């Protein structure tokens, strides 16, 4: 699997980390939705790292004339781009051509054959997921261990994948835990696990046995009408239309993926809630993308408004997409008031939080900005709610102008003094605990860094985070998820961790508040 990591880094990394050409802040009179559309339309698919099919087409037209192994790796890279764009069948078609090339060439290094079979197995397994987990989606689809309705109804592609990974383990030496793991997944998909997996490669069923007596949750999304397909995104579950039941809003990270609103129509005779999509009626047309979203009643009118966060993971080259503040009229209909509220901003972000930081009775807004290494450091925003529907950024004066590749922020009263403190999860550097020291003579809350004293700087490559009282002693405890060692296609540490083997992956942290 290491060769694949090299190709993906070479393909994506340069585009993601290249020094950006900074754009000027937009000041023209267009609406926020028009700004968003213009930004998305201006992105060049030839350079955008996630426009995989465009990149595959460009790569396919530029076949190298160098050494044989470089030619093969080039074709494998094109196949992976097609796979990343969702075209598993196209990837396999090109891989079949690579196989013929390898078979017609004498003395092919075993390592090159192994990389080929790993790539072929991944493409076949993905095709099986598309045909089954998506094409025949049900409550047990893609839930490990695969069983019942999770077993593939069309097992052909997964069976091909099973044979590929078994070959990698048995024919080339130096077997990897990642190949072992994928062999077992493919066997589950074809109902040949565990007995159909050779004992030396078998992942024992007890690996998936629960360690505690914890309730099992069933996936009712298909029955409820909310099994929406999309990329990773955010969600908000609350009563947005004021009828007493919980509605659902979901975003999706794709540049033109729609924001979706599912209205709760009540519980059916079988006890399952029923939802109806009302995205256009909710005013969501043109509200594209967003890896995350939050909700809160910023205007104190008794209903929940939305804030959509955009640009995450895209850097300052591609992530200059405006966020959106959507005001709820109380009946599940929303209006984009970003510009009128003074919140127009185009720096990439993944993380924000509503909270009454200045204790004046209305919700303020903290928005963290993602800054990759080598990019212009852009500080977080602390938008103080003026109480008239508008905000002002006072982050510098309040001590909240922190920077970094921020992947999560959360508010909580860690010292039980009645005001909200802030924790920021930063990927690639120590995290921050900023404790409020009180309201100053300027009327602003003031914060100071207490990270070292509290001992909560890790994990260094962290991700989502939240405060909660896990031990029910009245103090806010802190959970910080890790992404260290698990980035991208790096399956090996994930599999090793699940199997109880030593792993390079960085551990999550649960910090108990000792009061």
Annotate each PLM feature.
Residues 70, 79:
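Glycine/serine-rich loop-strand microenvironments at binding/catalytic pocket rims
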Residues 5-18:
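Bacterial N-terminal signal peptides
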Residues 1-3:
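N-terminal secretory signal peptides that target proteins for export/translocation
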Residues 23-63, 74, 81-515:
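Acidic, glycine/proline-rich Ca2+-coordinating loop motifs
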């Amino acid at each position: 699997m290491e060769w694949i990591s090299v190709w993906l880094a070479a393909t994506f990394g340069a585009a993601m980390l290249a020094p950006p050409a900074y754009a000027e802040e937009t000041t023209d009179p267009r609406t926020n939705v028009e700004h968003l559309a213009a930004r998305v339309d201006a992105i060049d698919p030839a350079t955008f790292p996630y426009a995989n099919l465009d990149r595959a087409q460009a790569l396919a037209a530029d076949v190298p004339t160098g050494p044989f192994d470089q030619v093969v790796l080039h074709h494998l890279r094109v196949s992976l781009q097609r796979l990343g764009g969702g075209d598993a069948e196209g990837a396999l078609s090109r891989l079949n051509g690579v196989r013929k090339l390898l078979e017609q060439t004498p003395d092919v290094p075993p390592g090159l054959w192994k990389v080929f079979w790993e790539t072929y197995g991944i493409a076949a397994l993905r095709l099986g997921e598309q045909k089954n987990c998506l094409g025949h989606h049900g409550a047990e689809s893609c839930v490990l261990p695969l069983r019942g309705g999770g077993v593939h109804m069309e097992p052909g592609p997964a069976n091909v994948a099973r044979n590929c990974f078994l070959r990698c383990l048995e024919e080339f030496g130096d077997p990897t835990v990642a190949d072992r793991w994928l062999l077992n997944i493919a066997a589950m998909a074809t109902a040949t696990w565990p007995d159909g997996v050779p004992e030396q490669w078998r992942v024992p069923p007890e690996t998936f046995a629960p360690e505690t007596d914890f309730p099992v949750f069933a996936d009712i999304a298909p029955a409820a009408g909310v099994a929406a397909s999309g990329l990773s995104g955010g969600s908000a579950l609350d009563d947005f239309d004021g009828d007493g039941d919980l509605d659902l809003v979901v975003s999706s990270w794709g540049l033109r993926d729609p924001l979706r609103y599912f209205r709760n129509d009540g519980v059916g005779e079988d006890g399952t809630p029923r939802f109806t999509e009302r995205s256009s009626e909710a005013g969501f047309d043109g509200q594209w993308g967003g890896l995350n979203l939050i909700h809160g009643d910023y205007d104190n009118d008794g209903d929940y408004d939305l804030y959509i966060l955009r640009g995450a993971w895209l850097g300052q080259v591609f992530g200059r997409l405006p966020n959106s503040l959507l005001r709820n009229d109380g009946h599940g209909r929303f209006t984009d008031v970003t510009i009128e509220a003074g919140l127009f901003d185009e720096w990439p972000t993944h993380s924000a939080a509503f909270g009454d930081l200045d204790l004046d009775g209305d919700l303020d807004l903290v928005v963290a900005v993602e800054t990759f290494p080598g990019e212009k450091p852009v500080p977080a925003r602390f938008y103080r709610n003026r109480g008239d529907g508008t905000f002002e950024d006072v982050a510098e004066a309040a001590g909240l102008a922190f920077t970094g590749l921020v992947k999560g922020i959360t508010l909580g009263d860690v010292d039980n003094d009645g005001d909200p403190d802030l924790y920021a999860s930063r990927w690639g550097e120590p995290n921050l605990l900023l404790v409020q020291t009180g309201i100053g003579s300027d009327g602003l809350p003031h914060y100071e860094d207490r990270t070292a004293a509290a001992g909560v700087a890790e994990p260094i490559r962290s991700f989502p985070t939240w405060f909660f009282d896990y031990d029910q002693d009245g103090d806010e405890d802190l959970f910080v998820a890790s992404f260290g060692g698990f980035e991208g296609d790096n399956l090996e540490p994930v599999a090793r961790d699940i199997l109880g083997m030593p792993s390079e992956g960085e551990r999550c942290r649960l910090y108990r508040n000792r009061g």
